[in-house]
């Protein structure tokens, strides 16, 4: 836009007694809404801005009356006139261009784009008005009218006076010093500053030498490692063929194993069938053997019972015979005792007679009678010993027979039970 034409339109608006809408100034507000570029000072277009704002609020109220429903309980209800006066009071108190000038111009030029109700529109205007930061017009900083700005961002135009950046955050923001850009790949000194050209050339030569040495060492390392890791492609092909052959062998071995497993499973099944048959036959044999054993045991039991009965009968018959034998043995014992007593008496009488004969003869007799008497004594002693041994044997036999009878007698009631 032409700044001179804009300034003339603003002067005409102030001179008029009856304020009306000016198309040139409306075009200026549309330009600010699109680009955010304010080419003139705030004091120059402040009056028309307030006039346009008041007119838009009044038109919005007439076209969109207040809603019929109750107000929102979460929001404080403020009447239209009070909200209008508050907004106008804030705007008249500005001494500079608010940094939300672009959004305010959008609301003034197209109010129904985002709002349909009066209350919401007024709250949107109030939110954009209650700010503190200010911006300067682009003409004051750059003295040119060929700058492009969109939403607060500067874009270079055809003017050569455009710098790299423009201060859009207000007058208080300091500008940084223009320092040469340093690439990260360039060598740096210990102080963080770029080195001189001579040192750069020397460093470049050193870097080239290092690169050559590194490349040579890397090639040597690769050549040393290559026989271990990276082999010749022909060898790789041979290895691949070897792997394929091994895979085929493994596949064949797997097939052979499968067939072997199948055959073994069939053999196992046949063996199991044979075992079942053998077990069945062995069971039959066991049954037959059990039957024969049962018959044998029954016959043995019958024979044992018959033998017991016979032994029982014989024992009963033997009891009186044994009693008679015992009686006879007792009689024999008594007879033997009587004979032994008689023999003793005879021996005593013989001894007394021999003594008498010795006394009467007084040693005049020969040794013959003495020897005869001694022989007689020996014979009598032998007879007595034989009789005593016989009697001992008889007693031992009788005691053994008595013990056998007692055991047989004790066994008989057990067998009867």
UniProtKB/Swiss-Prot annotation:
Keywords attached to this entry: Cytoplasm, Cytoskeleton, mRNA processing, mRNA splicing, Nucleus, Phosphoprotein
Biased composition regions of type Low complexity, renumbered to the chain: 214-226, 366-375
Compositionally biased tracts (Basic and acidic residues): 197-213, 231-258, 283-297, 318-327, 353-363
Gene Ontology CC entries for this record: centrosome; chromatin; cytoplasm; nucleoplasm; nucleus; protein phosphatase 4 complex
GO BP: mRNA processing; protein modification process; regulation of double-strand break repair; regulation of double-strand break repair via homologous recombination; RNA splicing
Effect annotated for changing residue 99 to A: No effect on RPA2-binding; decrease in PPP4C-binding
Region (Disordered): 140-417
MF terms in GO: protein phosphatase regulator activity; protein-macromolecule adaptor activity
Domain of life assignment: Eukaryota
InterPro entries recorded: PPP4R2
Polar residues bias (residue ranges): 140-149, 158-170, 186-196, 259-269, 385-399
Location of the protein in the cell: Cytoplasm, Cytoskeleton, Microtubule organizing center, Centrosome; Nucleus
Modified residues (Phosphoserine): 159, 226
Bias (Acidic residues): 298-311, 338-350, 400-417
Tissues where this protein is expressed: Widely expressed.
One Pfam family from the record: PPP4R2
Listed PANTHER family: PPP4R2-RELATED PROTEIN (PTHR16487), SERINE_THREONINE-PROTEIN PHOSPHATASE 4 REGULATORY SUBUNIT 2 (PTHR16487:SF5)
Similarity comment: Belongs to the PPP4R2 family.
Record text on subunit structure and interactions: Serine/threonine-protein phosphatase 4 (PP4) occurs in different assemblies of the catalytic and one or more regulatory subunits. Component of the PP4 complexes PPP4C-PPP4R2, PPP4C-PPP4R2-PPP4R3A and PPP4C-PPP4R2-PPP4R3B. The PPP4C-PPP4R2 complex appears to be a tetramer composed of 2 molecules of PPP4C and 2 molecules of PPP4R2. Interacts with DDX20/GEMIN3 and GEMIN4. Interacts with RPA2; this DNA damage-dependent interaction recruits PPP4C leading to RPA2 dephosphorylation.
Known function: Regulatory subunit of serine/threonine-protein phosphatase 4 (PP4). May regulate the activity of PPP4C at centrosomal microtubule organizing centers. Its interaction with the SMN complex leads to enhance the temporal localization of snRNPs, suggesting a role of PPP4C in maturation of spliceosomal snRNPs. The PPP4C-PPP4R2-PPP4R3A PP4 complex specifically dephosphorylates H2AX phosphorylated on 'Ser-140' (gamma-H2AX) generated during DNA replication and required for DNA double strand break repair. Mediates RPA2 dephosphorylation by recruiting PPP4C to RPA2 in a DNA damage-dependent manner.
Protein's name in the database: Serine/threonine-protein phosphatase 4 regulatory subunit 2
